[in-house]
Amino acid sequence: MDTQGPVSQPFQQPEKPGRVRRRKTRRERNKALVGSRRPLAHHDPPVAIRDPPVVPTASKLVVITQGRLSREHRGLFNHEVKSLDVARLLSSGTLVPGSPTLPAKPSPSPGRAQEPAPRSRDKENQVPGGSGPGPPSSPELSGVGQLLAELQCQLSLPQAFPRRNLIQDARDAIVHTLQACHGCVPDLALVLRGCQPPLPGAKPGVSERKMTPFWINSPDQVPEQERQRKQQGTKEFTFPMPYTSSMPTAHRGSLAPPRGPWPPYFPSLSSPSGTAWGPPTAFDLLKSIWLVATPPPPRPWGVGLPQPLPQPSSPLLPRTSVLDWSPSPPSPLPSLSWVVAQSSPEAWSFPPMRLY
């Protein structure tokens, strides 16, 4: 037989079926917390400690502007100015900005404190300064209207507020300044003439000739004296550099480089008349060493080396050589595979790229 008896089970509280405990909301918890701290009895403070009741400012010093009643509103920063204490703003500074305009008078009952409100509502529909159909209600409003009229004459309000044509105002100011200084408005065509490029048929001025290189202008635009001086040349300088051009010996000594700061010439660029070029320079010698004399023939598909640019006309060239060559449109640049095939003994072939 079992002598230990039944096994003791822990104590379990029997649960009631069908009842779920609801958790309080935050509002209920806060209400219970604040309600516990609230004093049991609320005593009113004594009359001496109470603040004087706030009395609205008298409606006599408040002016309702026209911006609330009509479209001719000139407000500040596009905000509607509904009321303005003109007497306080135009005073000599006796009132402190933080102090109220009128001393606060305590009223025995709150009903009397609300009496000025309907009065101010009645005056909202009145035009300031007594300019309405009826006479002004008080002499202070007429005085405020007089102050507003004087202020408007001093400030010139139509020019100090928006809805203006700024471009027209700026143009009028410029025209008035020119008329006051010079007596008339100058012709804009004469002013803008210096900003426009010169006409192709006109001769450039002295300043334009100094700034513009000679190869930009055509031989017709070069002055006659400079053209003759450049064509004659000088024999003061000699160059011991060996000649590599195809000019005859008799013609080499007659031509010399010009005195002006002209860029070096390029005799390697083929020209029909080789007798028109001057003596070679060190740059020509380097080009004769490094550059190929004859370019390779073009391929059947029309890809070849870029053609050399035609040499611009200069004062040293005779008129016949200028008419010999004709400019042609630039040819397309050769492809990379063609350049590699020309410089390598073996033909380079690249397989087509596959996109994955």
From Swiss-Prot:
Gene Ontology cellular component? Answer: chromosome; nucleus
Q: Which UniProt keywords apply?
A: Chromosome, Meiosis, Nucleus
InterPro entries, per the entry: Pro-rich_19 (IPR029355)
Keyword Transport applies: no
Q: Where in the cell is it found?
A: Nucleus; Chromosome
Q: Does the keyword Ligase apply?
A: no
Compositional bias, Polar residues, is annotated for 1-12
Superkingdom per UniProt? Eukaryota
Region annotated Disordered sits at: 1-53, 95-143, 216-255, 312-331
Residue spans of biased composition, Basic residues class: 19-29
Q: Tell me a GO biological process for this protein.
A: meiotic cell cycle
Main location, first listed in the record = nucleus
Describe the subunit structure.
Interacts with CNTD1.
Summarizing the function annotation, the protein's role is: Promotes meiotic crossing over formation through its interaction with CNTD1 by participating in the crossover differentiation step of crossover-specific recombination intermediates.
Which named protein is this? Proline-rich protein 19
Species this chain originates from? Homo sapiens (Human)
Please spell out the taxonomic lineage of the organism that makes this protein.
Eukaryota, Metazoa, Chordata, Craniata, Vertebrata
